[in-house]
Structures are given as structure tokens and as C-alpha cells.
């Protein structure tokens, strides 16, 4: 009887020890999982903050352009070029591939606009004799990329109608309706030769004197943009 009691006691101790070991292992795993989850959440929060700061910096570039246009009766191609060059974006914001200005062109003004761009010799002595709005065709209005910086490597974007493609048009319409910056979903830029994804950030530029509260949908709208 005593032997049975001793064996039973040893068995209970073994079971208790095993149960305690399993519980400790589960507790340790839970702690590790909790710590890993906490570290992941911290890393995600830091990454989100960094992304927001970077997006704020991108938007700041466009806000600066908005103010530059607001302070001038008309910003020509040479002035736009000199302004963007002074920003030194390649050094400070290397994620920005191109900064541009898209001009709203009603159908009735299309031919006059094309003629004006082709004969613009402020940057190139020969002007832009082959300039055309792309894709071709008659549409009620166009939002045409008129200025690009740097122009080298972004020739394919020059003349693109942002309203001709659904994702770009949606971002432009949201920007006009809100008066705030709007971004596209990831897209492949027309100047890309591969499948690299980027996104387009647009900020509206209204004609001088327009009421942003009452005339957003009816006023003449241009747009500054950055490809990122």
C-alpha cells in the first residue's frame, strides 16, 4: 500500500511537472507572440508616420507651386523650369520622378493651345513642332500636361490628357471638387518602359480670383502634379 502511495505520488508529481512545463511553454509562446505583435505594431506605426511625413513633403512641393502660380498672372515654361530646378528635388525628395503642370483646355481652344505650345521657344530654340494632345480625338475638355520637370526622360508624358484615363481623371475630379490634393491608385506611368508602379499626386490650381468655396466645379481648373 505504501509502495502504491509512493508511486502514485511520484506520478502526480510527474504530471504536475509536465503540466507546469506545458503551461510555461504556452505562456512563453504567448509572451513572445505578444511582444512580436507589439514590435510589428510599433514598426507599422513608425512606417505609417514616415510615409505620412513623406506624402506631406510631396504635397508641400505642390502647395509651393500653387502659391507660385497664384502670385503670377501667367507662369511661362521658363519660369516653371527655373522654379522647380531651385527646389533640388533629386537631392531632397528622390522619390519624385517628375513635377508637372497640366492645363485645362476646352475643345474650342484646343487648336490655339497646340499652336502656342509648338511655337514656345522659351526653353528650346526650335520650340515643340511635333507637340500634340494624346490620345487624339475630340473631347469636351482636356487636362493636358503642358510643363514637365525634368523634361528629359519624361517626354512621353508631355501632351498627355489626364482626363482620358479613368484613374487619372478620378483623381483630377476629386482634387477639383475638394480643393485638396488627390492621389491615384498605383499606376504605370506612360514614360515607364517596364512595369514599375508609381502614383500621381494632383493639386488644383484655380484661375486668379475664383472662389474656391462656390466655383470649384465651374471655374477654369489647371493642376500641378508629382509622379512618385
How would you label these PLM feature ranges?
Residues 27-60, 66, 70, 74, ...:
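Juxtamembrane membrane-water interface segments immediately C-terminal to a transmembrane helix
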Residues 3-30:
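Extreme N-terminal signal-anchor transmembrane helix of membrane signaling/transducer proteins, especially
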Residues 37-45, 70-226:
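Intrinsically disordered, low-complexity polar/acidic regions
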Residues 14-24, 52-58, 154-158:
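Short low-complexity stretches enriched in small and charged residues
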Residues 1, 225-228:
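Residue positions that mark polypeptide boundaries
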